[in-house]
Curated annotation (Swiss-Prot):
Together with the chaperonin GroEL, plays an essential role in assisting protein folding. The GroEL-GroES system forms a nano-cage that allows encapsulation of the non-native substrate proteins and provides a physical environment optimized to promote and accelerate protein folding. GroES binds to the apical surface of the GroEL ring, thereby capping the opening of the GroEL channel. NCBIfam families: PRK00364.1-2 (NF001527), PRK00364.1-6 (NF001530), PRK00364.2-2 (NF001531), PRK00364.2-4 (NF001533), PRK00364.2-5 (NF001534). Its main location: cytoplasm. Heptamer of 7 subunits arranged in a ring. Interacts with the chaperonin GroEL. SUPFAM superfamilies: GroES-like. Pfam families: Cpn10. HAMAP family: CH10. One of its GO terms (biological process) is chaperone cofactor-dependent protein refolding. The keyword Flavoprotein does not apply. The gene is groES. It comes from Synechococcus sp. (strain JA-3-3Ab). This is Co-chaperonin GroES. GO terms for cellular component: cytoplasm.
Length: 103
């Protein structure tokens, strides 16, 4: 079986799933103290990179997604599956795990 190279342009979420690029955290505090990775709070904000087509209701009708690529979102802290592509980190979430669009 051949190895597959993944990049963002080749990932298309299925159903009501959303691919979100995780926002980078500051490496140091406002007081200038550098934080080790173990002391950093897990980020809950990111930018939507790709969205699935939506999910189907009981009658089979497609319910379109409310999100679109480019939306900045707040999502549940422990939701989704984290994916690392190159040097960037992403999280694959179900639409229900998105709490809000950040304006």
């Amino acid at each position: 079986m051949a190895a597959v190279t993944l990049n963002v342009s080749t990932l298309k979420p299925l159903g009501d799933r959303v691919l979100v690029k995780i926002a980078q955290q500051d490496e140091k505090t406002a007081g200038g103290i550098f934080l080790p990775d173990t002391a950093k709070e897990k980020p809950q904000v990111g930018e939507v990179v790709a969205v699935g087509p939506g999910k189907r209701n009981d009658e089979g009708k497609l319910i379109p997604m409310e999100l679109k690529a480019g939306d900045r979102v707040l999502y549940s802290k422990y939701a989704g599956t984290e994916v690392k592509l190159g040097s960037d980190e992403y999280v694959l979430l179900a639409e229900r795990d998105i709490l809000a669009i950040v304006q």
